[in-house]
Amino acid sequence: IVFRAAQKRSDIEIVGINDLLDAEYMAYMLKYDSTHGRFDGTVEVKDGHLVVNGKTIRVTAEKDPANLKWNEIGVDVVAEATGIFLTDETARKHITAGAKKVVLTGPSKDNTPMFVRGANFETYAGQDIVSNRSCTTNCLAPLAKVINDNFGIIEGLMTTVHATTATQKTVDGPSHKDWRGGRGAAQNIIPSSTGAAKAVGKVLPELNGKLTGMAFRVPTPNVSVVDLTVRLEKAASYEEIKKAIKAASEGPMKGVLGYTEDDVVSTDFNGEVCTSVFDAKAGIALNDNFVKLV
């Protein structure tokens, strides 16, 4: 998914991929995707490397990032997407190998700085290793910031109705740490934990301790929804809240926070470029201080 997204940008050039998979299989997985469809371009393998749209991309299969020799192919930024090297110490091996910066595509396991577009991205000060947090945090944080900046959040609860992930089971299987997580993904709505709401307090310190949440894993292949229920400091009608979110989506958060009043469903957001889209018709207010946002 990182590769497909990067290929659509003129300001990003992919020069290398490190994966333990065979190059032929990597090409196959890039060409065909059950959720996002066929790749819009040409994909070949030559001399053990990928050739995408006529451009050769170096393929390596190193277990230790320190041996990757990123300097030989002029790597500026590494997208660390293995889910393994999630600390500054381990991710720094990419720097040792010649890369200039590393972006972790998931939450770090230490105090690696975390940045989320639409939340605290403007505070980035050139750190060489950063975390982009999780997809849920990227969805929740921009919305929470708009609400807090305009109306103030006293406290809130978040529920994410989350699409199936690759770690789930197709049928019931052993899962010693998470018994419910071992149940068949296609047959169940599975309650689960998530640190996304608490993580918002790390990228928006003014909300630290004010939000928490949980997740439901549901049998859909892609697109998740965040249900944010908050108690407001400043009374506001639902129309006023919508107006503030729409203004942000057309102004400072354009391209990050979207806004829609259409009668949409989850598949309408497959391939969405915004990290968060506010569904104006799905939310509801109990009163001017207690509101559910979707």
Curated annotation (Swiss-Prot):
Q: Specify which residues bind D-glyceraldehyde 3-phosphate according to the UniProt entry for this protein.
A: S134, C135, T136, T165, T194, G195, R217
Does Glycoprotein appear among the keywords?
Answer: no
* Record's subcellular location: Cytoplasm
- The EC number(s) given in the record are 1.2.1.12
Predominant place of localization? cytoplasm
Alphabetical GO biological process terms: glucose metabolic process; glycolytic process
- Marked site, Activates thiol group during catalysis, at H162
**Pathways involved:** Carbohydrate degradation; glycolysis; pyruvate from D-glyceraldehyde 3-phosphate: step 1/5
List the record's Gene Ontology CC terms alphabetically: cytoplasm
Identify the SMART domains for this entry.
Gp_dh_N (SM00846)
* Record-annotated active site: C135
The record's listing under InterPro entries reads: GlycerAld/Erythrose_P_DH, GlycerAld_3-P_DH_cat, GlycerAld_3-P_DH_NAD(P)-bd, Glyceraldehyde-3-P_DH_1, NAD(P)-bd_dom_sf
Citing just one GO molecular function, the answer is:
NADP binding
Catalytic activity reads: D-glyceraldehyde 3-phosphate + phosphate + NAD(+) = (2R)-3-phospho-glyceroyl phosphate + NADH + H(+)
- Main EC class the enzyme belongs to: oxidoreductase
Binding annotation for NAD(+): D19, K63, T105
Question: So which domain of life are we looking at?
Answer: Bacteria
Query: Which keywords, in A-to-Z order, does the entry hold?
Result: Cytoplasm, Glycolysis, NAD, Nucleotide-binding, Oxidoreductase
Q: Which family does it belong to?
A: Belongs to the glyceraldehyde-3-phosphate dehydrogenase family.
Summarize subunit and interaction data from the UniProt record for this chain: Homotetramer.
* Function summary: Catalyzes the oxidative phosphorylation of glyceraldehyde 3-phosphate (G3P) to 1,3-bisphosphoglycerate (BPG) using the cofactor NAD. The first reaction step involves the formation of a hemiacetal intermediate between G3P and a cysteine residue, and this hemiacetal intermediate is then oxidized to a thioester, with concomitant reduction of NAD to NADH. The reduced NADH is then exchanged with the second NAD, and the thioester is attacked by a nucleophilic inorganic phosphate to produce BPG.
What's the protein called, per UniProt? Glyceraldehyde-3-phosphate dehydrogenase
- Write down the species: Klebsiella aerogenes
